[in-house]
């Protein structure tokens, strides 16, 4: 995505995986965001870092939002697997992969991880996967619907994605 100007929703999506610490152990979280609006389109938690939970997140995003033009990821084995890349190609999606070790190529999803962890995850000690799923789900709704982004002219991801603005009452 380095030389592409992203100017509309669903032009480019990004995916990444992060660790979610628990009171005992950790879970893996995958999320797909719209590059233009920063909207979290789908996400999944798993206790294993396999391709299936990434495919579930992809299928959910495609079902609700249709295919993007471009899909960006790092070179993780889940995203380079034949099953995952074929799912993208089957929908006519152009695949873009970051350079090795270039987290800056996926800066918006890295920013999501930072916000999620400092505003939610690190403030809690989830005791069960179900608790983590509920609390992270609540945060994702907040992130999309209520959290203003300076880079979006202080609009929320939903306002930017759907082209709406709030008006003072």
State the predicted function of each range.
Residues 1-169:
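Charged DNA-binding/catalytic regions of mobile-element recombinases
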């Amino acid at each position: 995505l380095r030389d592409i100007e992203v100017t509309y929703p669903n032009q480019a999506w990004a995916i990444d995986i992060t660790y979610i610490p628990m009171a005992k152990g950790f879970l893996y979280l995958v999320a797909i965001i719209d590059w233009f609006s920063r909207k979290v389109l789908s996400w999944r938690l798993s206790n294993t870092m396999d391709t299936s939970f990434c495919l579930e997140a992809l299928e959910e995003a495609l079902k609700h939002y249709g295919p993007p033009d471009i899909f960006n990821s790092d070179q993780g084995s889940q995203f380079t697997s034949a099953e995952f890349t074929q799912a993208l190609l089957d929908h006519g999606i152009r695949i873009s992969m970051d350079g090795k070790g270039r987290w800056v190529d996926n800066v918006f999803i890295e920013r999501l991880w930072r916000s999620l962890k400092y505003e939610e995850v690190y403030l809690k000690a989830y005791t069960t996967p179900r608790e983590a799923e509920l609390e992270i789900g609540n945060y994702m709704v907040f992130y999309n619907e209520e959290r203003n982004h300076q880079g979006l002219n202080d609009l929320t991801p939903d306002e930017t994605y759907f082209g709406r603005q709030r008006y003072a009452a």
